[in-house]
Amino acid sequence: MDAAGRGCHLLPLPAARGPARAPAASSALSPAGLCSGTASASSAAAGAVAMNPSSSAGEERGATGGSSSSGSGAGSCCLGAEGGVDPRGAGAAAAAALEEPAAAGQKEKEEALEEKLRDLTFRKQVSYRKAISRTGLQHLAPAHPLGLPVANGPAKEPRATLDWSENAVNGEHLWLETNVSGDLCYLGEENCQVRFAKSALRRKCAVCKIVVHTACIEQLEKINFRCKPTFREGGSRSPRENFVRHHWVHRRRQEGKCKQCGKGFQQKFSFHSKEIVAISCSWCKQAFHNKVTCFMLHHIEEPCSLGAHAAVIVPPTWIIKVKKPQNSLKASNRKKKRTSFKRKASKRGTEQENKGRPFVIKPISSPLMKPLLVFVNPKSGGNQGTKVLQMFMWYLNPRQVFDLSQEGPKDALELYRKVPNLRILACGGDGTVGWILSILDELQLSPQPPVGVLPLGTGNDLARTLNWGGGYTDEPVSKILCQVEDGTIVQLDRWNLHVERNPDLPPEELEDGVCKLPLNVFNNYFSLGFDAHVTLEFHESREANPEKFNSRFRNKMFYAGAAFSDFLQRSSRDLSKHVKVVCDGTDLTPKIQDLKFQCIVFLNIPRYCAGTMPWGNPGDHHDFEPQRHDDGYIEVIGFTMASLAALQVGGHGERLHQCREVMLLTYKSIPMQVDGEPCRLAPAMIRISLRNQANMVQKSKRRTSMPLLNDPQSVPDRLRIRVNKISLQDYEGLHYDKEKLREASIPLGILVVRGDCDLETCRMYIDRLQEDLQSVSSGSQRVHYQDQETSFPRAISAQRLSPRWCFLDATSADRFYRIDRSQEHLHFVMEISHDEIFILDPDMVVSQQAGTPPGMPDLVVEQASGLSDWWNPALRKRMLSDSGMITPHYEDSDLKDFSHSRVLQSPVSSEDHAILQAVITGDLMKLMESYKNGGSLLIQGPGHCSLLHYAAKTGNGEIVKYILDHGPAELLDMADSETGETALHKAACQRNRAVCQLLVDAGASLRQTDSKGKTPQERAQQAGDPDLAAYLESRQNYKIIGHEDLETAV
């Protein structure tokens, strides 16, 4: 490894101005601190100039690694050879000894001691120079005797991307523009070039995270402060080392705790602190206090472990820059005579192959290593891709992270093709994944490395199938790396599309259209008809006017408008007349024509169209098997307009076949799309056949890299966890300050769950707890939490959670992170909490009353007359709801938001009549307008039915959803006075499946009976819809499971 990558890269700090603490005057490992152990003032000055002209003498410690006491200025401490401490410093002691009157014998002793200290100082300087030479810290020594700067010509433009050419410089920073406040220039006040400017452009290194002014970059290069090394120089004179040394960097702000003493780095006023508080390694992320008691000299020498993600990091010792061979005159004249006339094609081919490749990878095989290549598409997900790219550069070697907007993945995969146990992470959409899989096919790597997916943007059906979720929120990159490392390798079928001209049509009858598809291989789906027509219109409009499609919201609105327009025009209504489909020899054309499908999908994975499941889950009585992505079969599904609409609310299409080969003939130009890439294909014959199987990384539910779950003994049987909720306003303002965010949180209740409970199950319990709170809102009891630190009681929150709440991960050291709802089943409660869970409610109304900081609370109950027996733990009986939770009681004053009457009233105002008429006629716009003008949703019509009853009976899903979102929760299970039926009963009688699913998802009771004792499931059975009855029964059984898994105490 070269000199720049071997040791400690620390900022040379300026001389102390006035009294200061010892480590602030000169860092524990600043150049002055390394060589300033002088015994007199003159030797101290000489040592300071020799190593850093701008620094004064700093702290010193002996070779034994002992600690020095703090002094009042630079060079105020000096440690002796045996570790003894002289509080005044050697120079101060010698000066004081010359000034104080003493006896002759005492004076001789002092002179002898001074002579010994001089000798010791000389030996220390020699030893430090040797240590610097061994560790590669030549950048700390002056390049010129007087320390004068040397001009290197005109200033070059700061580099923002990695250099893969033969001119690449090891340890070169990657500068990105930044405007983050609170980060001071890394050079400090003494060396900063624009320290008096109020505002100056700054840049941040994406690799080591230091911030400097743009004008100070040249000064940073003069002091030779290098970034962490990413490769090593080749050549016989550079012996290979199999380990990496630390890359130490000064930090003015640092999260976490000191590796040595275990204490935090918090300061009283740390936002604009100019003091160096920590020294951290850019590789392993270990951090130490900037004190000689914590950071010691041997830390420079010791190898770096590369931290928690060492198994996926490509060490810089593996990446070698090969020097270009220089042709000498003697070598050119000494040409050996050829004794053979065999062709040298292989050698010439190798030379051509290696031409232009100054880098090679020489890995060291280890069964514990799973090196990771990260490919990021910055154009996916707005600006998410750019942020993800920078975060991976911080955690990994930048030369294993590639920006796909700069170049494709082929060169990187070719470079790393011989690395064993290689894994790939594709950060982007499904198109990015398909691009990488196609390159892997082209290179024919053996074995093929598995590919994981970090979903960016929208859609992401393949990522959903592999448990990576529908999109990236703000999950810590550290956890993503653990998930990729521990993920399960599964297979993904890939299918060929072979297109030929339709032989049944003469050339003169061929219509306009392209003669080939955009892709000849698909991983997700291949479709034709309505969905492809809508996608094609969007792509054609975006290509014609790209400036009108720069907003995700506008894109969605255009999709909706195009779909509605196509629905009215019925442009795909005759699709079944112009296609012929043969699956494994079975002709499906008659069935397609009978059912008049307007869309046909050949589906490889269970997900389609941003998460829907068109194949569904066929039962045992069907002739089809559940869908899999590795069984070598493709599913053929037909859609009418009705089934396409039902797809968004849990429905499925018409299952046609599961086959290994498809022959498709089209007799007119038809819109088609391959994995989201649309075109209008001329009449053709298309053959679909299995191509191969790709290795993919599936996100595992249990993460073996988490030490908490490694040991089965560490998982308790039961967890008692307090639930706190946080508003979006507090989260956005305080999510980097965990303590203040805890103070701003509001207690919600206490759950007692199983030790292996996941978040999906926990969500059900929290929602049920909210329902229990509302059902007893008329009680006269008030419950408080008592803070153990302040002893002040805190009333729990009475505000109902909105449907959009999500869990927060509170275990990270730096901040809270949101957890995607689609990935809740992959997280355990123990992974995101320590005795308490935090949830984020974006619609929560922030209270003006400031809360006290919550500790681990005790339950305190204010006794009320008539209820003391219920609240006595020894006498009270367990009151169970459907989910098995104890029903708490609260005082009316705590539930003032829900204290108004829930009794249905007849329409009074004109707006009330307008709302009732809008619901009966199905006019959503009129309903929204009347409600905004003051109309009530708690009105009744003829037959004493609520608005939700009418909406459920008519089957208008949009109106049902609007009432659920804006109306009180009591409407869900409210029964009419004549039949005792709830809204779910009405929808089940009318066999409105979509409405039933909306009501069930909103929390409607599945076991409430009508006046005849019938449940909604029994009503659906009587109405002749066994599928709907089976669905309601399965949802009822799913909720009953919670009885044995949950105990709630309030």
Curated annotation (Swiss-Prot):
Keywords: ANK repeat, ATP-binding, Cell membrane, Cell projection, Cytoplasm, Cytoplasmic vesicle, Kinase, Lipid metabolism, Membrane, Nucleotide-binding, Nucleus, Repeat, Synapse, Transferase. Residues 332-347 have a biased composition (Basic residues). It is an enzyme of class 2 (transferase). Residues 52-73, 325-356 are annotated as: Disordered. ANK repeats lie at residues 943-972, 979-1008. CDD domains: C1_DGKiota_rpt1, C1_DGKiota_rpt2. Its EC number is 2.7.1.107. The keyword ATP-binding applies. GO terms for cellular component: axon terminus; cytoplasm; cytosol; dendritic spine; excitatory synapse; extrinsic component of postsynaptic density membrane; extrinsic component of presynaptic active zone membrane; glutamatergic synapse. Its main location: other. One of its GO terms (molecular function) is small GTPase binding. GO terms for biological process: diacylglycerol metabolic process; excitatory postsynaptic potential; habituation; intracellular signal transduction; lipid phosphorylation; neurotransmitter secretion; phosphatidic acid biosynthetic process; phospholipase C-activating G protein-coupled receptor signaling pathway. InterPro entries: Ankyrin_rpt, Ankyrin_rpt-contain_sf, ATP-NAD_kinase_N, C1_DGKiota_rpt1, C1_DGKiota_rpt2, DGK, DGKI-like_dom, Diacylglycerol_kin_accessory. Interacts (via PDZ-binding motif) with DLG4; controls the localization of DGKI to the synapse. Interacts (via PDZ-binding motif) with DLG1. Interacts (via PDZ-binding motif) with DLG2. Interacts (via PDZ-binding motif) with DLG3. May interact with RASGRP3; involved in the regulation of RASGRP3 activity. This is Diacylglycerol kinase iota. It comes from Rattus norvegicus.
